């Protein structure tokens, strides 16, 4: 194995010092639409349904959607110009949080890096589910919003139905952060807090320019687990980390 390959492997397989379990409540402030495939929808179904858990049929927010949105917002905030860089050319701070593949989109070699952040699919909180299932909604725990586009030349209308998660719904938010270098935890948490702040000033899902997908984050908590150093982070320090993340949210 070459020195370069060994160096790459070391970067990909950094020592795991511990884990931070980050939790919060994500509240839907305006109707949310993260689309699911409608290729096999029955006649009379909604034109554009939202993504659901296949077992419970409840709406979910895919972890991939949240990860992609946070990363894109952070990269856009750091980039001058209109063209975003290839993922392999993201800043070191972004790459260590979100990871980077060995090959870029152009097929060229990049510096592969394992993501320190592990995302989860967000599911409705139990209290929110109990509240929403009692409402008379157009679909199961969903509302229908009619949208329309008008052809400027022919004046022909193109109405369609968009399924949304109703405003007021709350999801259980969770991230796990891998501690690899203790001296980088504060910087990583500050960057994550910036991303969460940007998210709440932007939108999640589709049709954001029309007012969809505004969200807020509340009630951050952080817990710590480590086999090698179980007492390395005090509760006071964990509360400080939660406060840093909450600067992008709102405390309640």
PLM region spans:
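RNA-binding basic/glycine-rich loop and surface signature characteristic of RAMP-family CRISPR effectors
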Residues: 2-149, 154-252
């Amino acid at each position: 194995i070459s020195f370069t390959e060994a160096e790459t492997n070391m970067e990909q397989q950094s020592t795991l010092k511990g884990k931070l379990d980050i939790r919060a409540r994500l509240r839907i402030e305006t109707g949310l639409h993260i689309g699911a495939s409608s290729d096999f929808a029955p006649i009379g179904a909604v034109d554009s349904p939202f993504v659901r858990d296949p077992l419970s049929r409840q709406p979910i927010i895919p972890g991939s959607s949240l990860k992609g949105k946070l990363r894109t917002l952070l990269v856009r905030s750091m980039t001058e110009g209109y063209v975003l860089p290839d993922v392999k050319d993201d800043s070191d701070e972004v790459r260590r949080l979100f990871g980077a593949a060995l090959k870029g989109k152009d097929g060229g070699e990049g510096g592969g890096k394992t993501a320190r952040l592990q995302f989860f699919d967000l599911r409705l909180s139990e209290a929110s589910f109990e509240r929403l299932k009692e409402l008379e909604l157009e679909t199961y725990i969903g509302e229908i919003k009619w949208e329309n586009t008008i052809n400027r030349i022919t004046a022909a209308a193109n109405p369609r139905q968009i399924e949304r998660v109703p405003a007021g719904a709350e999801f259980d938010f969770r991230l796990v952060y891998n501690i690899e270098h203790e001296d980088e935890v504060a910087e990583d948490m500050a960057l994550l807090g910036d991303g969460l702040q940007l998210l709440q000033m932007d939108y999640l899902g589709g049709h954001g320019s029309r007012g969809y997908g505004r969200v807020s984050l509340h009630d951050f908590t952080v817990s710590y687990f480590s086999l090698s150093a179980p007492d390395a982070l005090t509760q006071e320090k964990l509360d400080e980390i939660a406060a840093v993340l909450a600067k992008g949210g709102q405390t309640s």
